[in-house]
Amino acid sequence: MERPEPELIRQSWRAVSRSPLEHGTVLFARLFALEPDLLPLFQYNCRQFSSPEDCLSSPEFLDHIRKVMLVIDAAVTNVEDLSSLEEYLASLGRKHRAVGVKLSSFSTVGESLLYMLEKCLGPAFTPATRAAWSQLYGAVVQAMSRGWDGE
């Protein structure tokens, strides 16, 4: 896999990182629209959410969104040395497997990430920027998938 274009990623992330909760909410709203079967995986204090809107307004889920955006931020920060995050990302993969997330769902997460970036950046979300983010996300998922494989 080619290395992602670091400057395109950093530049585009600057706009997103100004409002991580807002943009993270767009990402998860899109995720639940594309793959509604993921909603039951998110339970806090044994509480099942009745709708994506119910989940997206929950303080516990908003905390999850913040954490996801921090992981993306770490990937952006380390875009030129993602190997420094390998162990952390594999551990994150194991945690997601343990709560019932299927590895195949990360394809939908990737689509949702690109959707959020496009909504946030508008015309600045060029084909080159999309390609750079796709490469970065692919590398992150590859590292996380080691948590499924038990490596």
From Swiss-Prot:
Name the chemical reaction catalysed here: Fe(III)-heme b-[protein] + nitric oxide + H2O = Fe(II)-heme b-[protein] + nitrite + 2 H(+)
Q: What is its EC number?
A: 1.7.-.-
Question: One GO MF term, please?
Answer: nitrite reductase activity
> Could you say which tissues express the protein in this record?
Predominantly expressed in brain, the strongest expression is seen in the frontal lobe, the subthalamic nucleus and the thalamus.
Which domain of life, per UniProt?
Eukaryota
- What is the annotated localization of this protein? Cytoplasm, Cytosol; Mitochondrion matrix
Cite the Globin domain residue spans from the record: 1-149
Does the entry feature the keyword Protein biosynthesis, yes or no? Answer: no
The residues that cross the membrane are none
Ordered alphabetically, the record's keywords are: Cytoplasm, Disulfide bond, Heme, Iron, Metal-binding, Mitochondrion, Oxidoreductase, Phosphoprotein
What cellular component terms from Gene Ontology apply here?
A: cytosol; mitochondrial matrix
An example GO biological process term is: cellular response to hypoxia
Q: Which InterPro entries match?
A: Globin, Globin-like_OT, Globin-like_sf, Globin/Proto
Outcome when changing residue 50 to A? Decreased interaction with 14-3-3 proteins
Q: What is the effect of changing residue 17 to A?
A: No effect on interaction with 14-3-3 proteins
Cysteine disulfide links:
46-55
PTM summary from the entry reads:
Phosphorylated during hypoxia by ERK1/ERK2. Phosphorylation regulates the heme pocket hexacoordination preventing the association of His-64 with the heme metal center. Thereby, promotes the access of dioxygen and nitrite to the heme and stimulates the nitrite reductase activity. Phosphorylation during hypoxia is stabilized by 14-3-3 proteins. An intramolecular Cys-46/Cys-55 disulfide bond, not necessarily present in orthologs, regulates the heme pocket hexacoordination preventing the association of His-64 with the heme metal center. Thereby, promotes the access of dioxygen and nitrite to the heme and stimulates the nitrite reductase activity.
Transmembrane helix recorded as keyword: no
Stated family? Belongs to the globin family.
What task does this protein carry out? Monomeric globin with a bis-histidyl six-coordinate heme-iron atom through which it can bind dioxygen, carbon monoxide and nitric oxide. Could help transport oxygen and increase its availability to the metabolically active neuronal tissues, though its low quantity in tissues as well as its high affinity for dioxygen, which may limit its oxygen-releasing ability, argue against it. The ferrous/deoxygenated form exhibits a nitrite reductase activity and it could produce nitric oxide which in turn inhibits cellular respiration in response to hypoxia.
- Assembly and interaction partners: Monomer. Homodimer and homotetramer; disulfide-linked. Mainly monomeric but also detected as part of homodimers and homotetramers. Interacts with 14-3-3 proteins; regulates the phosphorylation of NGB. Could interact (ferrous form) with G-alpha(i) proteins (GTP-bound form).
Matching PANTHER family: BLR2807 PROTEIN, NEUROGLOBIN
Quote the protein name from its UniProt record. Answer: Neuroglobin
Species per Swiss-Prot/TrEMBL record: Homo sapiens
User: Which gene is this protein's source?
Assistant: NGB
